[in-house]
């Protein structure tokens, strides 16, 4: 995050230089209409994760998996990120990976919506479609095949990566208590 001083000495604070800097710190909204409608004494809150840059809670997971891989040395300059997905994690990974300068290949079943495909491509990812009749198992197999063929590649592994749930333990949960 930078501060910019404009002509006349006006200071613009909170200027971000990359989309991944905007992940997290999403607002909480009290759902008063539901509380009233159900005559509840308890309070109900919603964490508005659509405020994340790529529009979902999966942005947190994407950022955590990429940053953990960078710290461990699995991911470095010139690496290619590969991920099998059916949607939001792939969108989040495409957003964060592109912002950090990585090439990313998203593998998804051909049965996924055209809108998801367009969004993934709009974030700068290469999209590889797998056989829709094989579901996510087919997408995982295709991603593993690509990883064997592409040097310096890294599968983020949302389904098995402990950074996925850890992201919420370290960010989402504490944010709820801080708000």
Task: Identify the role of each PLM range.
Residues 4-179:
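PLP-dependent amino-acid enzyme catalytic core
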């Amino acid at each position: 995050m930078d501060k910019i001083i404009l002509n006349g000495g006006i200071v613009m604070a909170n200027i971000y230089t990359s989309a991944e800097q905007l992940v997290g710190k999403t607002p909480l909204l009290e759902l008063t209409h539901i509380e009233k409608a159900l005559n509840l004494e308890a309070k109900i809150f919603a964490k508005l994760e659509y405020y994340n840059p790529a529009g979902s809670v999966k942005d947190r997971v994407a950022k955590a998996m990429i940053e953990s891989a960078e710290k461990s040395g699995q991911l470095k300059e010139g690496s290619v990120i590969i991920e099998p997905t059916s949607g939001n994690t792939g969108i989040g990974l495409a957003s964060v990976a592109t912002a950090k300068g990585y090439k990313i290949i998203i593998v998804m079943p051909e049965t996924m919506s055209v809108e998801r495909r367009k969004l993934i491509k709009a974030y700068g990812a290469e999209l590889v479609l797998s056989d829709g009749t094989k579901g996510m198992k087919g997408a995982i197999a295709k991603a593993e095949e690509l990883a064997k063929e592409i040097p310096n590649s890294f599968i983020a592994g949302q389904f098995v990566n402990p950074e996925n749930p850890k992201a919420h333990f370290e960010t989402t949960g504490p944010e709820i208590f801080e708000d």
